[in-house]
């Protein structure tokens, strides 16, 4: 496959992506289609039974109209049931969480601007805030990646590992640390606090939040009639978890993307040409920088010099 032209490699990549897209659609249709049809049939049966029982005092179409209004309101993030104090969706902690979901492109939940002014401000806020967020992320990446390269360099020196093996070891360790600290542990806490949430649902919520998928209508504490102070503190804690977790996930992904094995896969789709200094840089350059900051290992006293 090394003799393929660049346009052939790009075409192969596009075809592989389309095949993966189609495979995902088929699998999701097979898994989610039958449960959705089953729930729809159950809802229709319940609706028909309710209409038959209250036909004398219920005008035709009144129940469907009421349910349509309630569902449309719920789809915009406005609670129609439960405690009225909890139903205030646009309080300050919830608004902070919504603003963070815009700047981090997470966008989970049902909150959405309803007024024309809110929609216009959301577009302007995102247009100005997203570039600023990207600049902040780039700055944090530039500051934190050299710090992460120092343990890798220490391991390479003291364990006599090559830079590539030390980088792979650090990437695996960092991935496990992020997965346990920002996915599994918060999922266990959410599973214990949120009574109506399964462990798989809690793991899915944490993963979808940190991966910016955001396809989740679960918001911790919503619908449990909590004290307003506890509920607001929970929203602020969720905001802090989202920001810190996204930063940790970004560093883990960046560490994996700088592995020589991953960079070699990327070079397959680049135009063939001489190897540039940029291609030779990356993680090995960070190792050299980190090695230069380490003090030289002093030989042990009384130890014979190695031949």
From Swiss-Prot:
Residues 1-10, 141-170, 254-307 are cytoplasmic. Residues 92-119, 199-227 dip into the membrane without crossing it. Gene3D superfamilies: 1.10.287.70. The chain crosses the membrane at residues 11-31, 120-140, 171-191, 233-253. Its main location: membrane. The keyword Ion transport applies. One of its GO terms (molecular function) is outward rectifier potassium channel activity. GO terms for biological process: potassium ion transmembrane transport; potassium ion transport. One of its GO terms (cellular component) is monoatomic ion channel complex. It is found in: Membrane. It comes from the Eukaryota. InterPro entries: 2pore_dom_K_chnl, 2pore_dom_K_chnl_TASK, 2pore_dom_K_chnl_TWIK, K_chnl_dom. Glycans are attached at residue 83. The keyword Transmembrane helix applies. It is a multi-pass membrane protein. Keywords: Glycoprotein, Ion channel, Ion transport, Membrane, Potassium, Potassium channel, Potassium transport, Transmembrane, Transmembrane helix, Transport, Voltage-gated channel. Probable potassium channel subunit. No channel activity observed in vitro as protein remains in the endoplasmic reticulum. May need to associate with an as yet unknown partner in order to reach the plasma membrane. Belongs to the two pore domain potassium channel (TC 1.A.1.8) family. Homodimer. This is Potassium channel subfamily K member 7. It comes from Homo sapiens (Human).
């Amino acid at each position: 496959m090394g003799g393929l032209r660049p346009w052939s490699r790009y075409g192969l990549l596009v075809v592989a992506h389309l095949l993966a897209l189609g495979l995902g659609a088929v699998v999701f249709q097979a898994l989610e289609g039958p449960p959705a049809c089953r729930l729809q049939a159950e809802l229709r049966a319940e609706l028909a039974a309710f209409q038959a029982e209250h036909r004398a005092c219920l005008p035709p179409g009144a129940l469907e109209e009421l349910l349509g209004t309630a569902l449309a309101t719920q789809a915009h993030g406005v609670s129609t049931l439960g405690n009225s104090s909890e139903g205030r969706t646009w309080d300050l902690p919830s608004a902070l969480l919504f603003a963070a979901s815009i700047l981090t492109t997470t966008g989970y939940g049902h909150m959405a601007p309803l007024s024309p002014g809110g929609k216009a401000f959301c577009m302007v806020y995102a247009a100005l805030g997203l570039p600023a967020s990207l600049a902040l992320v780039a700055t944090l990446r530039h500051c934190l990646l050299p710090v992460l390269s120092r343990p890798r360099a220490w391991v390479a020196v003291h364990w006599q590992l090559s830079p590539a093996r030390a980088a792979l070891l650090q990437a695996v360790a960092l991935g496990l640390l992020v997965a346990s600290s920002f996915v599994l542990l918060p999922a266990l806490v959410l599973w214990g606090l949120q009574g109506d949430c399964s462990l798989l649902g809690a793991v899915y919520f944490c993963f979808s939040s940190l991966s910016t998928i955001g396809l989740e209508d679960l918001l911790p504490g919503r619908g449990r009639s909590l004290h307003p102070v506890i509920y607001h503190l929970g929203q602020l804690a969720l905001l802090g978890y989202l920001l810190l977790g996204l930063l940790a996930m970004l560093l883990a992904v960046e560490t994996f993307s700088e592995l020589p094995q991953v960079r070699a896969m990327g070079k397959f789709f680049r135009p063939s040409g001489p190897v540039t200094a940029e291609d030779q840089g990356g993680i090995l350059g960070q190792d050299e920088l980190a090695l230069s900051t380490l003090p030289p290992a002093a030989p042990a006293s009384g130890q014979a010099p190695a031949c």
